[in-house]
Each structure stands twice: as C-alpha cells, then as structure tokens.
Amino acid sequence: MKESVISSFDYLKSMTSFDPKTPQYMVNFLKKSEHYCIGVIDIVNSSEISSLLTTKELEKYYGSFLNIMAKIVDQNRGFVIKNIGDCLLFYFPNFAETQTNDKFINCLNCGLKMTEIHSEINQYFKEIELPPINYRISADYGEVSIMKTNFSPNIDLFGTPVNRCVKINHLAKQNSMIIGRDMYRIVKKNADFAYEKIGNYAVNTRFAYPVYSVRKYSNII
C-alpha cells in the first residue's frame, strides 16, 4: 500500500514538471512576480445581443470591437493578454510606486480613450447594419504571477489584481471607467483626472474594497 502511494506521488510530481517539448499542454510560472496595472473591458448585455445576430454577424461585431480596443491598448503602450469571450484583458508592465507614474497615466488614458470612442464605434456599426454596443472598463494595480505555456509564446497573468479587476467591472456605468483602491492611491494626486468614489466591492463579510470612477478633469469644467 505504501509503495502504491509513493508511486502515485512520484507519478503526479512528474506530471507537474514543465517540459516545453511535450505535445501535451503544460504551464510554467516564472520565478519572479511583477507589479502590473491590469485593465478589463467588457461588453454590456452581450448574451442578448448574441441571440439576435447570425454567426457571421457575431464574428464581425465582436471582431471589430476587440480589434479596435486592442489597437487603443497598443497606442497607449499596453499589451493585450487575451480575450475571454467578449471581454478583453490587458496590462501595463513595470509598475512600481517608487518609479514615475507615466505608465499609470497611460493606463488611465487608454481606458478613457475607450470611453471617448463609443459614439464613433456605434456610428460605424450603424453603417454596417450592426446593433449599437455598450461596455464597461475597469483597472487596478498590484502584484501578479506570470505564466507561460508550451503552446504559446504569450504570457498570462494570475493574481488578486486580475481577479479584482474582473469582479469590480460591473460597478462601472455603461461606457465609463472605474479603478480600484490600490490604483487610486497612486494616481489620486494627478490633477489631470477627477475621481469619485462610487461604491465598494464586497470581498467578504469583513472587507469592502473601494472603487472610483475616473474622468478627464478638462471634461468637467
């Protein structure tokens, strides 16, 4: 019995060893974690919209939206991690509170540009006979683990900032941007942006995580 348990343990341990040449899907976490800013943009009522469109129309609808948003991320020096259905996950690397906050500003500018282009996207969709689109943007900052697979050169990110960013997204109003407390603490003194606390995300029964809306200050004066 003991030999059987040891054998099973060794077998399971061998299955966890990363082999980049194996034909099986495997993951490997880099030894060093990083502090990144994470962003998410998610379409509102996508299930209802999907039910009204053909497969070809859906491909054009989501493909156009995701490509436009990915381009905005790139223009602001961010990187797309992946899309999860109609949701786009992206990040801005090499953040640290001891460094200048230029890349935090890039993240804010990226999200706000996404909100500003809303009417233009809907005008384009109208011209190609697709329904209007609405979406929400959320961002936060913190320590993440970096994962790679043997099937792709691209990275994936895991950690509390990623989870929180996805969880708080629904608190944003349509076609607006929100940020979590950890990012707010770093950018709140920047005079180019205006912030307003809009509520809390209940992490558990004891802890509520504050969430803030973001706007360009020039747009409210």
Briefly describe each language-model feature range.
Residues 140, 160-185:
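Catalytic/regulatory signature loops of cyclic-dinucleotide turnover enzymes
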Residues 25-106:
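Catalytic NTP-binding/metal-coordinating core of nucleotidyl cyclase/transferase enzymes
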Residues 61-65, 110, 114, 161-164:
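Hydrophobic alpha-helical membrane-association signature
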Residues 1-25, 174-221:
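Intrinsically disordered, glycine/charged-rich C-terminal tails and inter-domain linkers
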Residues 77-103, 121-160:
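Catalytic core of nucleotidyl cyclases, primarily class III adenylyl/guanylyl cyclases
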Residues 66, 70, 112-122, 169:
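Structural signal for well-ordered, non-membrane alpha-helices
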